[in-house]
Amino acid sequence: MKGNKGIRIAILIVIYLLWLGCTYYVLLPALNPHSIGFWLYLALVVLLPPALVSLFHTSDVKVTKKGVKMVKAVANTPAKILFGAIGACIIIILIGDIAGAKLFHAKGYASILKTEDYEFSEDINQQTALSMIALMDTNSAIRLGNREIGSLSDLVSQYDVSDDYSQIDRNGAPQKVSALRYAGFFKWWGNRDKGVPGYVAVDPVEQNADYVKLEKGMRYVPSAYFNTDLERNIRFHYPTAIFGNTHFEVDEEGNPYYVASVYTYKIGLFGGDTVKGAIICDPTNGDCDYYDVAEIPAWVDDVFDGELLTKQYNWTGELGNGFWNSLFGKKGCKKCTETYNSEDENYVADYGYVAKDGDIWIYTGITSVNDDASNIGFILVNQRTSEAHYYSIAGADENSAMSAAEGEVQEKGYQASFPSLINVYDKPTYVMVLKDASGIVKLYAMVNVEQYNIVTTASNLDDCFSKYKKLVKAGGDEDAVDDGDTNDDGDETKLKDPVDLEVTIASIEYVAIGGDTYVYLEAEDGTILRQKFADNESLISLRIGDKIKVNAQQSETGTYYINTISK
Protein backbone atom coordinates (compact mmCIF):
# COMPACT_ATOMS: atom_id res chain seq x y z
CA MET A 1 0.00 0.00 0.00
CA LYS A 2 2.80 2.39 0.86
CA GLY A 3 4.34 1.82 -2.56
CA ASN A 4 1.02 2.43 -4.27
CA LYS A 5 0.55 5.57 -2.20
CA GLY A 6 3.91 6.90 -3.38
CA ILE A 7 2.98 6.21 -6.99
CA ARG A 8 -0.35 8.01 -6.53
CA ILE A 9 1.42 11.02 -5.07
CA ALA A 10 3.91 11.07 -7.95
CA ILE A 11 1.08 10.87 -10.49
CA LEU A 12 -0.77 13.71 -8.73
CA ILE A 13 2.37 15.85 -8.80
CA VAL A 14 2.86 15.24 -12.53
CA ILE A 15 -0.80 16.04 -13.23
CA TYR A 16 -0.53 19.20 -11.11
CA LEU A 17 2.59 20.38 -12.95
CA LEU A 18 0.92 19.71 -16.30
CA TRP A 19 -2.12 21.65 -15.05
CA LEU A 20 0.06 24.62 -14.11
CA GLY A 21 1.92 24.56 -17.41
CA CYS A 22 -1.21 24.27 -19.57
CA THR A 23 -3.18 26.95 -17.71
CA TYR A 24 -0.26 29.38 -17.81
CA TYR A 25 0.20 28.69 -21.54
CA VAL A 26 -3.47 29.45 -22.20
CA LEU A 27 -4.20 32.25 -19.68
CA LEU A 28 -0.81 34.05 -19.87
CA PRO A 29 -1.14 35.95 -16.57
CA ALA A 30 1.34 38.69 -15.73
CA LEU A 31 3.42 37.48 -12.78
CA ASN A 32 3.12 40.87 -11.13
CA PRO A 33 1.47 41.75 -7.78
CA HIS A 34 -0.07 44.87 -9.39
CA SER A 35 -2.21 42.60 -11.58
CA ILE A 36 -5.53 41.37 -10.17
CA GLY A 37 -5.24 38.53 -12.66
CA PHE A 38 -2.05 37.37 -10.92
CA TRP A 39 -3.80 36.99 -7.56
CA LEU A 40 -6.77 35.21 -9.14
CA TYR A 41 -4.42 32.87 -10.98
CA LEU A 42 -2.53 32.17 -7.77
CA ALA A 43 -5.74 31.48 -5.82
CA LEU A 44 -7.83 29.56 -8.35
CA VAL A 45 -5.22 27.81 -10.48
CA VAL A 46 -2.15 27.33 -8.27
CA LEU A 47 -3.66 26.88 -4.77
CA LEU A 48 -7.22 25.61 -5.22
CA PRO A 49 -6.51 22.20 -6.89
CA PRO A 50 -4.06 20.95 -4.19
CA ALA A 51 -6.37 22.37 -1.52
CA LEU A 52 -9.27 20.30 -2.85
CA VAL A 53 -7.10 17.17 -3.08
CA SER A 54 -5.93 17.69 0.50
CA LEU A 55 -9.49 18.27 1.66
CA PHE A 56 -10.68 14.88 0.39
CA HIS A 57 -7.59 13.05 1.61
CA THR A 58 -8.69 12.99 5.28
CA SER A 59 -8.18 9.39 6.46
CA ASP A 60 -5.79 6.45 6.49
CA VAL A 61 -7.47 3.21 5.43
CA LYS A 62 -6.69 -0.49 5.76
CA VAL A 63 -7.87 -3.24 3.41
CA THR A 64 -9.05 -6.44 5.18
CA LYS A 65 -10.98 -9.55 4.16
CA LYS A 66 -14.10 -7.74 5.31
CA GLY A 67 -13.40 -4.74 3.13
CA VAL A 68 -11.91 -1.27 3.53
CA LYS A 69 -11.63 -0.13 7.12
CA MET A 70 -10.90 3.41 8.37
CA VAL A 71 -8.04 3.31 10.83
CA LYS A 72 -7.75 6.93 11.95
CA ALA A 73 -8.58 10.42 10.87
CA VAL A 74 -5.69 12.49 9.63
CA ALA A 75 -5.31 16.08 10.73
CA ASN A 76 -5.82 18.03 7.50
CA THR A 77 -3.18 20.71 8.08
CA PRO A 78 -2.15 21.12 4.38
CA ALA A 79 -5.75 21.83 3.34
CA LYS A 80 -6.12 24.43 6.07
CA ILE A 81 -2.91 26.13 5.00
CA LEU A 82 -3.88 26.12 1.32
CA PHE A 83 -7.40 27.43 1.89
CA GLY A 84 -5.92 30.05 4.20
CA ALA A 85 -3.59 31.13 1.39
CA ILE A 86 -6.56 31.34 -1.01
CA GLY A 87 -8.38 33.52 1.52
CA ALA A 88 -5.27 35.69 1.83
CA CYS A 89 -5.25 36.24 -1.96
CA ILE A 90 -8.88 37.34 -1.89
CA ILE A 91 -8.19 39.67 1.05
CA ILE A 92 -5.21 41.19 -0.79
CA ILE A 93 -7.45 41.90 -3.81
CA LEU A 94 -10.12 43.53 -1.63
CA ILE A 95 -7.69 45.56 0.48
CA GLY A 96 -5.65 46.55 -2.57
CA ASP A 97 -8.79 47.76 -4.32
CA ILE A 98 -10.02 49.72 -1.30
CA ALA A 99 -6.58 51.17 -0.56
CA GLY A 100 -6.43 52.64 -4.06
CA ALA A 101 -9.95 54.11 -3.96
CA LYS A 102 -10.52 57.67 -5.18
CA LEU A 103 -12.03 58.46 -1.77
CA PHE A 104 -8.54 58.34 -0.24
CA HIS A 105 -6.43 59.50 -3.19
CA ALA A 106 -8.41 62.13 -5.10
CA LYS A 107 -5.40 64.43 -5.47
CA GLY A 108 -3.22 61.54 -6.61
CA TYR A 109 -5.63 60.59 -9.38
CA ALA A 110 -6.04 64.23 -10.42
CA SER A 111 -2.28 64.67 -10.84
CA ILE A 112 -1.55 61.65 -13.06
CA LEU A 113 -2.16 63.52 -16.34
CA LYS A 114 -0.41 66.87 -16.15
CA THR A 115 -1.90 69.53 -18.44
CA GLU A 116 -0.53 72.96 -19.33
CA ASP A 117 -2.52 75.96 -20.56
CA TYR A 118 -1.81 77.10 -24.13
CA GLU A 119 -3.22 79.71 -26.50
CA PHE A 120 -5.00 77.94 -29.33
CA SER A 121 -4.01 80.49 -31.99
CA GLU A 122 -0.33 80.24 -31.00
CA ASP A 123 -0.05 76.48 -30.49
CA ILE A 124 -2.11 75.27 -33.46
CA ASN A 125 -0.85 76.57 -36.80
CA GLN A 126 -3.37 78.19 -39.10
CA GLN A 127 -4.63 75.73 -41.67
CA THR A 128 -3.62 76.72 -45.19
CA ALA A 129 -4.28 73.30 -46.74
CA LEU A 130 -6.18 70.25 -45.58
CA SER A 131 -3.66 67.52 -46.42
CA MET A 132 -2.87 66.87 -42.74
CA ILE A 133 -6.41 66.28 -41.52
CA ALA A 134 -7.40 62.69 -40.79
CA LEU A 135 -11.19 62.65 -41.10
CA MET A 136 -11.72 58.97 -41.79
CA ASP A 137 -13.24 56.84 -39.04
CA THR A 138 -12.37 53.19 -38.52
CA ASN A 139 -15.52 51.86 -40.20
CA SER A 140 -14.70 53.73 -43.41
CA ALA A 141 -11.12 52.44 -43.27
CA ILE A 142 -12.42 48.88 -42.85
CA ARG A 143 -14.63 49.26 -45.90
CA LEU A 144 -11.79 50.57 -48.08
CA GLY A 145 -9.34 47.96 -46.81
CA ASN A 146 -11.72 45.08 -47.46
CA ARG A 147 -12.39 46.39 -50.96
CA GLU A 148 -8.66 46.53 -51.70
CA ILE A 149 -7.98 42.98 -50.48
CA GLY A 150 -11.12 41.68 -52.17
CA SER A 151 -9.59 42.64 -55.51
CA LEU A 152 -6.51 40.46 -54.87
CA SER A 153 -7.60 36.92 -55.69
CA ASP A 154 -4.39 35.27 -54.44
CA LEU A 155 -4.93 36.67 -50.93
CA VAL A 156 -8.66 36.78 -50.31
CA SER A 157 -8.99 33.00 -49.90
CA GLN A 158 -6.31 32.79 -47.22
CA TYR A 159 -6.36 36.12 -45.39
CA ASP A 160 -8.63 38.98 -44.49
CA VAL A 161 -7.92 42.43 -43.07
CA SER A 162 -7.97 42.97 -39.33
CA ASP A 163 -10.59 45.47 -38.19
CA ASP A 164 -8.07 46.97 -35.75
CA TYR A 165 -6.82 49.99 -37.71
CA SER A 166 -4.18 52.20 -36.09
CA GLN A 167 -3.96 55.94 -36.70
CA ILE A 168 -0.33 56.89 -37.34
CA ASP A 169 1.72 59.79 -38.71
CA ARG A 170 4.08 58.51 -41.38
CA ASN A 171 6.58 60.88 -42.94
CA GLY A 172 4.48 63.85 -41.85
CA ALA A 173 1.16 62.58 -43.23
CA PRO A 174 -1.73 60.88 -41.41
CA GLN A 175 -2.37 57.25 -42.27
CA LYS A 176 -4.42 54.32 -41.02
CA VAL A 177 -2.79 50.88 -41.13
CA SER A 178 -3.93 47.34 -40.43
CA ALA A 179 -2.21 44.00 -40.93
CA LEU A 180 -3.76 41.09 -42.75
CA ARG A 181 -4.77 38.13 -40.58
CA TYR A 182 -5.21 34.43 -41.13
CA ALA A 183 -8.77 33.49 -42.08
CA GLY A 184 -8.99 30.75 -39.44
CA PHE A 185 -6.92 27.94 -37.91
CA PHE A 186 -6.51 25.84 -41.05
CA LYS A 187 -5.44 28.87 -43.10
CA TRP A 188 -2.82 29.55 -40.42
CA TRP A 189 -1.67 25.93 -40.51
CA GLY A 190 -1.24 26.00 -44.27
CA ASN A 191 0.62 29.34 -44.30
CA ARG A 192 2.40 29.30 -40.94
CA ASP A 193 5.89 29.03 -42.41
CA LYS A 194 5.62 32.01 -44.76
CA GLY A 195 3.47 34.12 -42.43
CA VAL A 196 1.16 37.05 -43.15
CA PRO A 197 2.36 38.62 -46.43
CA GLY A 198 1.48 42.29 -45.94
CA TYR A 199 -0.73 45.05 -44.62
CA VAL A 200 -3.19 47.68 -45.79
CA ALA A 201 -2.40 51.40 -45.65
CA VAL A 202 -5.35 53.78 -45.90
CA ASP A 203 -4.99 57.46 -46.78
CA PRO A 204 -7.68 59.22 -44.71
CA VAL A 205 -7.34 62.41 -46.76
CA GLU A 206 -7.60 60.96 -50.27
CA GLN A 207 -9.99 58.22 -49.06
CA ASN A 208 -8.12 55.37 -50.75
CA ALA A 209 -6.37 52.17 -49.66
CA ASP A 210 -3.24 50.34 -50.84
CA TYR A 211 -2.02 46.84 -50.11
CA VAL A 212 1.66 46.76 -49.12
CA LYS A 213 3.42 43.45 -49.79
CA LEU A 214 6.33 42.63 -47.47
CA GLU A 215 9.60 41.00 -48.47
CA LYS A 216 9.40 38.76 -45.39
CA GLY A 217 6.10 37.53 -43.97
CA MET A 218 4.89 38.28 -40.44
CA ARG A 219 4.73 35.03 -38.40
CA TYR A 220 4.14 36.46 -34.91
CA VAL A 221 0.69 37.98 -35.21
CA PRO A 222 -2.56 38.02 -33.17
CA SER A 223 -4.25 35.58 -35.56
CA ALA A 224 -1.48 32.95 -35.24
CA TYR A 225 -1.61 29.99 -32.86
CA PHE A 226 0.60 28.32 -30.26
CA ASN A 227 4.10 29.79 -29.91
CA THR A 228 3.70 32.25 -32.80
CA ASP A 229 0.66 33.87 -31.21
CA LEU A 230 1.73 37.49 -30.67
CA GLU A 231 0.51 37.87 -27.09
CA ARG A 232 2.10 34.55 -26.07
CA ASN A 233 5.39 35.56 -27.67
CA ILE A 234 5.43 38.87 -25.79
CA ARG A 235 4.47 37.19 -22.51
CA PHE A 236 7.28 34.64 -22.77
CA HIS A 237 9.74 37.50 -23.34
CA TYR A 238 8.33 39.59 -20.47
CA PRO A 239 6.55 37.35 -17.90
CA THR A 240 6.09 40.15 -15.34
CA ALA A 241 4.94 42.95 -17.67
CA ILE A 242 1.33 44.18 -17.52
CA PHE A 243 0.76 45.04 -21.16
CA GLY A 244 -2.18 45.94 -23.37
CA ASN A 245 -3.23 48.21 -26.26
CA THR A 246 -1.35 45.83 -28.55
CA HIS A 247 -1.65 47.19 -32.06
CA PHE A 248 -0.01 47.32 -35.47
CA GLU A 249 2.19 50.20 -36.67
CA VAL A 250 4.80 50.78 -39.36
CA ASP A 251 7.94 52.90 -39.19
CA GLU A 252 8.82 55.66 -41.65
CA GLU A 253 10.24 53.11 -44.12
CA GLY A 254 7.09 50.99 -43.99
CA ASN A 255 8.56 48.16 -41.88
CA PRO A 256 5.90 46.41 -39.75
CA TYR A 257 5.87 46.23 -35.95
CA TYR A 258 3.47 45.45 -33.16
CA VAL A 259 3.49 47.85 -30.22
CA ALA A 260 2.20 46.97 -26.74
CA SER A 261 1.84 49.55 -23.97
CA VAL A 262 3.26 48.49 -20.59
CA TYR A 263 1.27 49.69 -17.60
CA THR A 264 2.08 50.59 -14.04
CA TYR A 265 -0.13 51.57 -11.11
CA LYS A 266 0.72 54.69 -9.16
CA ILE A 267 -1.89 54.44 -6.39
CA GLY A 268 -2.01 51.37 -4.17
CA LEU A 269 -1.84 47.98 -5.85
CA PHE A 270 -4.42 48.46 -8.58
CA GLY A 271 -5.22 52.18 -8.83
CA GLY A 272 -4.01 55.08 -10.95
CA ASP A 273 -3.09 53.11 -14.07
CA THR A 274 -0.78 54.75 -16.56
CA VAL A 275 1.87 53.78 -19.10
CA LYS A 276 5.52 53.39 -18.15
CA GLY A 277 6.86 52.12 -21.46
CA ALA A 278 6.25 50.04 -24.56
CA ILE A 279 7.26 46.67 -25.98
CA ILE A 280 7.99 46.70 -29.71
CA CYS A 281 7.83 43.32 -31.46
CA ASP A 282 9.19 42.57 -34.92
CA PRO A 283 6.51 40.19 -36.26
CA THR A 284 8.81 38.70 -38.90
CA ASN A 285 11.09 37.05 -36.31
CA GLY A 286 9.42 37.57 -32.92
CA ASP A 287 12.19 39.75 -31.45
CA CYS A 288 10.93 42.06 -28.70
CA ASP A 289 12.45 45.17 -27.12
CA TYR A 290 11.21 47.22 -24.16
CA TYR A 291 11.54 51.02 -24.03
CA ASP A 292 10.74 53.44 -21.24
CA VAL A 293 8.37 56.23 -22.29
CA ALA A 294 11.20 58.75 -22.69
CA GLU A 295 13.15 56.36 -24.96
CA ILE A 296 10.37 55.18 -27.30
CA PRO A 297 11.34 55.73 -30.98
CA ALA A 298 9.80 58.81 -32.57
CA TRP A 299 8.03 56.80 -35.30
CA VAL A 300 5.82 55.09 -32.71
CA ASP A 301 2.54 57.00 -32.47
CA ASP A 302 0.18 55.14 -30.13
CA VAL A 303 1.50 54.40 -26.64
CA PHE A 304 -1.11 56.13 -24.48
CA ASP A 305 -4.40 55.05 -26.05
CA GLY A 306 -7.29 57.49 -26.27
CA GLU A 307 -9.51 55.68 -23.76
CA LEU A 308 -6.77 55.84 -21.12
CA LEU A 309 -6.03 59.53 -21.77
CA THR A 310 -9.69 60.60 -21.61
CA LYS A 311 -10.10 58.59 -18.39
CA GLN A 312 -7.04 60.26 -16.88
CA TYR A 313 -8.28 63.72 -17.85
CA ASN A 314 -11.66 62.96 -16.28
CA TRP A 315 -9.79 62.18 -13.06
CA THR A 316 -8.11 65.58 -13.35
CA GLY A 317 -11.33 67.43 -14.16
CA GLU A 318 -13.59 65.75 -11.62
CA LEU A 319 -11.25 65.11 -8.66
CA GLY A 320 -9.09 68.26 -8.77
CA ASN A 321 -11.07 69.85 -5.92
CA GLY A 322 -11.45 66.67 -3.89
CA PHE A 323 -13.54 63.52 -3.88
CA TRP A 324 -16.59 64.85 -2.01
CA ASN A 325 -16.75 67.90 -4.28
CA SER A 326 -16.97 65.54 -7.27
CA LEU A 327 -20.15 64.03 -5.77
CA PHE A 328 -21.96 67.00 -4.26
CA GLY A 329 -20.79 70.58 -4.81
CA LYS A 330 -19.09 69.79 -8.14
CA LYS A 331 -17.36 73.17 -8.10
CA GLY A 332 -15.03 73.45 -11.08
CA CYS A 333 -15.73 69.86 -12.17
CA LYS A 334 -15.33 69.15 -15.88
CA LYS A 335 -15.02 66.15 -18.16
CA CYS A 336 -14.31 65.08 -21.72
CA THR A 337 -17.06 65.33 -24.32
CA GLU A 338 -19.22 62.21 -24.50
CA THR A 339 -21.09 60.69 -27.43
CA TYR A 340 -23.73 57.98 -27.42
CA ASN A 341 -22.46 54.44 -27.95
CA SER A 342 -25.27 52.42 -29.51
CA GLU A 343 -23.55 49.09 -28.80
CA ASP A 344 -23.23 49.64 -25.05
CA GLU A 345 -26.31 51.92 -24.94
CA ASN A 346 -24.57 54.58 -22.89
CA TYR A 347 -22.49 57.73 -23.27
CA VAL A 348 -18.71 57.38 -23.47
CA ALA A 349 -15.85 59.84 -23.82
CA ASP A 350 -15.00 60.35 -27.49
CA TYR A 351 -12.08 61.96 -29.27
CA GLY A 352 -10.59 62.75 -32.64
CA TYR A 353 -7.06 62.72 -34.05
CA VAL A 354 -4.75 65.56 -35.05
CA ALA A 355 -1.38 65.13 -36.79
CA LYS A 356 1.02 67.61 -35.19
CA ASP A 357 4.82 67.85 -35.06
CA GLY A 358 5.27 64.35 -36.48
CA ASP A 359 3.07 62.72 -33.82
CA ILE A 360 -0.56 61.76 -33.46
CA TRP A 361 -2.42 63.73 -30.80
CA ILE A 362 -5.93 63.02 -29.60
CA TYR A 363 -8.21 65.96 -29.09
CA THR A 364 -11.52 66.23 -27.30
CA GLY A 365 -13.73 68.98 -26.02
CA ILE A 366 -13.99 69.71 -22.31
CA THR A 367 -17.42 70.41 -20.87
CA SER A 368 -18.91 70.90 -17.44
CA VAL A 369 -20.32 67.84 -15.68
CA ASN A 370 -23.81 69.34 -16.07
CA ASP A 371 -24.06 68.16 -19.72
CA ASP A 372 -25.10 71.56 -21.12
CA ALA A 373 -24.14 70.85 -24.78
CA SER A 374 -21.32 73.40 -24.75
CA ASN A 375 -17.57 73.23 -24.31
CA ILE A 376 -15.46 75.34 -22.00
CA GLY A 377 -12.23 74.27 -23.67
CA PHE A 378 -10.26 71.58 -25.47
CA ILE A 379 -7.35 69.30 -24.71
CA LEU A 380 -4.76 68.02 -27.14
CA VAL A 381 -2.72 65.05 -25.85
CA ASN A 382 0.29 63.42 -27.47
CA GLN A 383 -0.29 59.66 -27.75
CA ARG A 384 3.42 58.86 -27.57
CA THR A 385 4.47 61.02 -24.62
CA SER A 386 1.14 62.02 -22.92
CA GLU A 387 2.11 65.71 -23.19
CA ALA A 388 -1.22 67.51 -22.68
CA HIS A 389 -2.23 71.03 -23.82
CA TYR A 390 -5.39 72.75 -22.60
CA TYR A 391 -7.09 75.56 -24.54
CA SER A 392 -9.70 77.68 -22.81
CA ILE A 393 -12.28 78.23 -25.56
CA ALA A 394 -16.02 78.43 -25.02
CA GLY A 395 -18.26 77.15 -27.77
CA ALA A 396 -20.40 74.35 -29.11
CA ASP A 397 -19.46 70.82 -28.18
CA GLU A 398 -18.82 68.16 -30.80
CA ASN A 399 -22.34 66.74 -30.62
CA SER A 400 -23.86 70.16 -31.33
CA ALA A 401 -21.48 70.69 -34.24
CA MET A 402 -22.35 67.30 -35.70
CA SER A 403 -26.05 68.13 -35.40
CA ALA A 404 -25.48 71.52 -37.07
CA ALA A 405 -23.71 69.86 -40.00
CA GLU A 406 -26.44 67.23 -40.34
CA GLY A 407 -29.06 69.99 -40.23
CA GLU A 408 -27.55 71.63 -43.31
CA VAL A 409 -28.55 68.59 -45.37
CA GLN A 410 -31.28 67.12 -43.21
CA GLU A 411 -33.35 66.12 -46.24
CA LYS A 412 -30.59 63.66 -47.21
CA GLY A 413 -30.41 61.97 -43.81
CA TYR A 414 -26.59 61.95 -43.72
CA GLN A 415 -24.77 61.24 -40.45
CA ALA A 416 -21.73 63.18 -39.28
CA SER A 417 -18.61 61.48 -37.98
CA PHE A 418 -16.79 62.72 -34.88
CA PRO A 419 -14.98 65.89 -36.03
CA SER A 420 -11.37 66.95 -36.06
CA LEU A 421 -10.22 70.37 -34.88
CA ILE A 422 -8.30 72.92 -36.99
CA ASN A 423 -7.32 76.58 -36.86
CA VAL A 424 -8.82 78.84 -39.55
CA TYR A 425 -8.01 82.55 -39.20
CA ASP A 426 -7.25 81.87 -35.50
CA LYS A 427 -10.77 80.50 -35.10
CA PRO A 428 -11.16 76.95 -33.75
CA THR A 429 -13.11 75.01 -36.35
CA TYR A 430 -14.65 71.56 -36.49
CA VAL A 431 -14.20 69.65 -39.73
CA MET A 432 -15.97 66.34 -40.38
CA VAL A 433 -17.42 64.05 -43.00
CA LEU A 434 -21.09 63.32 -43.65
CA LYS A 435 -21.93 59.73 -44.62
CA ASP A 436 -25.00 58.06 -46.01
CA ALA A 437 -26.71 55.00 -44.53
CA SER A 438 -24.19 52.73 -46.27
CA GLY A 439 -21.27 54.51 -44.63
CA ILE A 440 -20.09 56.15 -47.86
CA VAL A 441 -18.63 59.65 -47.50
CA LYS A 442 -20.92 62.06 -49.35
CA LEU A 443 -20.04 65.53 -48.06
CA TYR A 444 -17.55 67.44 -45.97
CA ALA A 445 -18.62 69.95 -43.35
CA MET A 446 -16.96 72.71 -41.34
CA VAL A 447 -18.49 74.32 -38.26
CA ASN A 448 -17.20 77.30 -36.29
CA VAL A 449 -16.71 76.34 -32.62
CA GLU A 450 -17.61 79.74 -31.16
CA GLN A 451 -20.44 80.46 -33.63
CA TYR A 452 -21.87 77.14 -34.70
CA ASN A 453 -24.35 78.85 -37.00
CA ILE A 454 -21.36 79.32 -39.34
CA VAL A 455 -21.59 76.04 -41.25
CA THR A 456 -20.50 75.03 -44.74
CA THR A 457 -20.79 71.77 -46.65
CA ALA A 458 -19.38 70.66 -50.00
CA SER A 459 -18.73 67.50 -51.96
CA ASN A 460 -14.97 67.88 -51.65
CA LEU A 461 -12.74 69.19 -48.91
CA ASP A 462 -11.08 72.01 -50.86
CA ASP A 463 -14.42 73.55 -51.79
CA CYS A 464 -15.72 73.21 -48.25
CA PHE A 465 -12.59 74.92 -46.94
CA SER A 466 -12.86 77.76 -49.46
CA LYS A 467 -16.54 78.38 -48.73
CA TYR A 468 -15.92 78.30 -44.99
CA LYS A 469 -13.11 80.86 -45.15
CA LYS A 470 -15.33 83.23 -47.12
CA LEU A 471 -18.13 82.81 -44.60
CA VAL A 472 -15.81 83.48 -41.66
CA LYS A 473 -14.50 86.63 -43.34
CA ALA A 474 -18.10 87.76 -43.85
CA GLY A 475 -18.85 87.22 -40.16
CA GLY A 476 -21.28 84.39 -40.90
CA ASP A 477 -23.45 86.44 -43.25
CA GLU A 478 -24.00 84.22 -46.29
CA ASP A 479 -25.53 87.10 -48.27
CA ALA A 480 -22.30 89.06 -47.88
CA VAL A 481 -20.14 86.28 -49.31
CA ASP A 482 -18.62 87.14 -52.68
CA ASP A 483 -18.84 84.06 -54.84
CA GLY A 484 -15.88 85.32 -56.84
CA ASP A 485 -14.71 83.65 -60.01
CA THR A 486 -15.91 80.21 -60.95
CA ASN A 487 -13.20 77.93 -62.28
CA ASP A 488 -13.62 75.55 -65.17
CA ASP A 489 -14.45 72.72 -62.77
CA GLY A 490 -17.70 74.45 -61.87
CA ASP A 491 -16.98 75.03 -58.17
CA GLU A 492 -16.98 78.31 -56.28
CA THR A 493 -13.30 78.57 -55.48
CA LYS A 494 -12.13 82.18 -55.85
CA LEU A 495 -9.27 82.38 -58.34
CA LYS A 496 -6.61 84.96 -59.12
CA ASP A 497 -5.88 86.29 -62.60
CA PRO A 498 -4.50 83.78 -65.15
CA VAL A 499 -0.72 83.36 -65.32
CA ASP A 500 1.62 81.43 -67.63
CA LEU A 501 3.92 78.86 -66.00
CA GLU A 502 6.68 76.57 -67.25
CA VAL A 503 7.33 73.65 -64.89
CA THR A 504 8.79 70.14 -64.77
CA ILE A 505 6.49 67.40 -63.46
CA ALA A 506 7.72 65.67 -60.29
CA SER A 507 4.63 63.56 -59.52
CA ILE A 508 1.19 62.77 -60.94
CA GLU A 509 -1.86 61.75 -58.88
CA TYR A 510 -5.39 60.83 -59.95
CA VAL A 511 -7.93 61.74 -57.26
CA ALA A 512 -11.66 60.99 -57.16
CA ILE A 513 -13.66 63.98 -55.88
CA GLY A 514 -17.42 64.12 -55.88
CA GLY A 515 -17.72 61.38 -58.50
CA ASP A 516 -15.22 63.02 -60.90
CA THR A 517 -11.54 62.25 -61.48
CA TYR A 518 -9.06 65.09 -61.11
CA VAL A 519 -5.41 65.04 -62.14
CA TYR A 520 -3.01 66.66 -59.68
CA LEU A 521 0.46 67.57 -60.91
CA GLU A 522 3.28 68.50 -58.56
CA ALA A 523 6.15 70.43 -60.12
CA GLU A 524 9.77 70.12 -59.05
CA ASP A 525 9.53 73.55 -57.43
CA GLY A 526 6.57 72.41 -55.31
CA THR A 527 3.82 74.05 -57.39
CA ILE A 528 0.54 72.09 -57.34
CA LEU A 529 -1.70 72.14 -60.44
CA ARG A 530 -5.00 70.40 -61.09
CA GLN A 531 -7.53 69.82 -63.86
CA LYS A 532 -10.61 67.66 -64.28
CA PHE A 533 -9.69 64.62 -66.36
CA ALA A 534 -12.98 64.68 -68.28
CA ASP A 535 -12.11 68.18 -69.55
CA ASN A 536 -8.71 67.14 -70.91
CA GLU A 537 -8.16 63.43 -71.43
CA SER A 538 -4.75 64.12 -72.97
CA LEU A 539 -3.51 64.49 -69.39
CA ILE A 540 -3.09 60.71 -69.38
CA SER A 541 -0.07 61.09 -71.69
CA LEU A 542 1.88 63.13 -69.15
CA ARG A 543 4.90 61.51 -67.49
CA ILE A 544 7.14 62.41 -64.58
CA GLY A 545 9.99 64.56 -65.90
CA ASP A 546 7.93 66.17 -68.68
CA LYS A 547 8.38 69.92 -69.08
CA ILE A 548 5.02 71.61 -69.63
CA LYS A 549 3.62 75.07 -70.27
CA VAL A 550 0.35 75.93 -68.58
CA ASN A 551 -2.03 78.83 -68.28
CA ALA A 552 -3.58 78.59 -64.83
CA GLN A 553 -5.27 80.51 -62.02
CA GLN A 554 -4.19 80.19 -58.40
CA SER A 555 -6.80 79.49 -55.72
CA GLU A 556 -6.77 80.70 -52.10
CA THR A 557 -5.37 77.32 -51.05
CA GLY A 558 -2.37 77.76 -53.37
CA THR A 559 -3.42 75.19 -55.97
CA TYR A 560 -3.30 76.29 -59.63
CA TYR A 561 -6.39 75.45 -61.72
CA ILE A 562 -5.27 74.66 -65.26
CA ASN A 563 -6.93 76.45 -68.19
CA THR A 564 -4.62 75.20 -70.96
CA ILE A 565 -1.61 72.89 -71.00
CA SER A 566 1.02 71.95 -73.60
CA LYS A 567 4.40 70.27 -73.73
What residue ranges belong to the model's regions?
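Soluble extracytoplasmic regions of secretory-pathway and membrane proteins
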Residues: 4-567
